[in-house]
Regions:
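Terminal-proximal interaction/regulatory segments of ATP-powered molecular machines
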Residues: 2-56
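Conserved phosphate-coordination/catalytic loops
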Residues: 6, 118-122, 189-190
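Well-ordered alpha-helical segments embedded in enzymatic catalytic cores
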Residues: 11-14, 123-127, 194-195
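Aromatic- and histidine-enriched alpha-helix N-cap/loop-to-helix transition segments
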Residues: 15, 119-122, 218, 354
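Alpha-helix N-cap/helix-initiation sites
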Residues: 22, 37-41, 121, 139-143, ...
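Mg2+-dependent phosphoryl-transfer active-site scaffold
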Residues: 55-87, 109, 127-131, 137-142, ...
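Helix-rich "cap/lid" substructures immediately adjacent to catalytic or cofactor-binding pockets
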Residues: 98-141
């Protein structure tokens, strides 16, 4: 509000100094007062609809985690949970001998503890365990940049091994970055409100909120910046409800129980890839549109990694890469690299830069960027692409 008043004062003083016509100056000053009044009223109106009590980002989640006996602090309990999860995910032998894995976990744990995000991670992990194991609600394997966290994988927050797919932690949490930390949880569409009710019963109505985004309010950005905090979104996906219903029908028809491991089938099944190659993907999340099915027939994907690449390229910013990627896969175009050091990171995608992780690793390898700096570079490049596409 003070900024608006100061801005209007400066505008009025400028009008007085530069105007040669008194009547014209009075008209301009009146309009300036009207503009300032409208802006102030909009902000007051917006704040009256959002009586937020802004607190420390992690303080609320700290209050929700109970530290078991035998642990002196939340950080100690968090580290113990991560280590136990690492042994389950990777095995005791690998955890003991793999220096790269040890260093990655240690690095992530330090960043998380420094930012006091331990309770945030534990809260999400406990919520997913409760909904999946005890409430029998299916959830997705992990969405967006949280999939780059080995700690999240060890805690059961995601089912994607970041080390296997070359995913980077700094895409999710960057101490020198500007984006807020947020985790999206995909759950069955029909069960979303059941999870909301569970949260209300266990943590109280005052701890939850249904959020909407009103794009027409230009002044909303100021409130959003002030109110940045740790949040998570529960997103209902119909495909998960359909998958669960299919498994129930199979059990009923064939009389055999389908375990939850069926939600993570082998990724090299020839019959499955034949369906993709023939574009029989109606109802398959991300692969059901007419244009995507056309690309599937042209690309003829034969590996899980190629499906990931096609899904990634099917975006306004980089959709033009599909043509070159497809030609290189089928030997219709030579695979080239602008620098010999690039082959290490681009070989899997036939020399085409598709992922932000590739940009980050290349900048670290060639320009000696830190992981945090490389994340900012990748974001800047992607933002530029988005601006140009618009």
């Amino acid at each position: 509000m003070e900024r608006i008043i100061a801005q209007n004062r400066d505008e009025i003083m400028h009008i007085i100094r530069t105007s040669k016509n008194t009547q014209s100056a009075c008209s301009q000053i009146q309009r300036q007062f009207e503009v300032g009044y409208i802006k102030a009223k909009q902000i007051i109106n917006y704040l009256s609809m959002s009586p937020l009590q802004i607190q420390s980002q992690s303080s609320k989640f700290h209050d929700l985690i109970k530290i078991p006996e035998g642990f002196e602090s939340l950080s100690q309990y968090f580290i113990a949970r991560v280590n136990a999860g690492a042994e389950l995910r990777y095995g005791l032998e690998r955890v003991s001998c793999d220096n790269a894995l040890h260093d990655r976990i240690e690095h992530e744990v330090k960043q998380i503890c420094d930012l006091r995000f331990e309770s945030y991670f534990l809260f999400i992990a406990d919520l997913l365990h409760e909904t999946f194991e005890n409430m029998n609600i299916y959830h997705g394997p992990g969405r967006s940049s949280v999939a780059g966290s080995v700690v999240a994988y060890c805690l059961g927050m995601t089912d994607i091994d970041p080390l296997k797919y070359g995913l980077l932690f700094e895409r999710f949490i960057n101490p020198i970055g500007v984006s807020k930390v947020q985790i999206d949880i995909d759950v069955e569409y029909d069960e979303r409100l059941r999870i909301v009710d569970y949260l209300k019963q266990n943590y109280g109505d005052d701890q939850l909120a249904h959020l909407i985004d009103l794009d027409l309010l230009a002044q909303k950005s100021a409130v959003i910046q002030v109110g940045k905090g740790l949040t998570f979104d529960i997103i209902g996906l119909r495909i998960l409800s359909i998958m669960k219903e299919c498994l129930k029908n199979i059990e009923h028809k064939y009389g055999s129980e389908i375990t939850k491991s069926a939600m993570n089938p082998p990724k090299d099944d020839p019959q499955t890839f034949r369906l993709f190659q023939e574009a029989h993907t109606f109802g398959v999340f991300y692969f059901e549109s007419d244009e995507m099915r056309r690309y599937l027939k042209i690309l003829q994907p034969s590996t899980f990694e190629e499906l990931i690449a096609l899904n990634t390229m099917y975006r306004p910013r980089i959709i033009d890469c599909i043509d070159g990627y497809t030609k290189r896969k089928h030997g219709l175009e030579a695979i080239t690299y602008d620098h010999p050091m690039m082959e290490k990171y681009l070989k899997e995608t036939y020399g085409v830069i598709i992922y932000q992780e590739q940009l980050m690793l290349l900048s670290q390898e060639i320009a000696n960027f830190t992981p945090e700096e490389s994340d900012l570079l990748a974001r800047a490049i992607c933002h530029q692409r988005l601006t140009q596409s618009e």
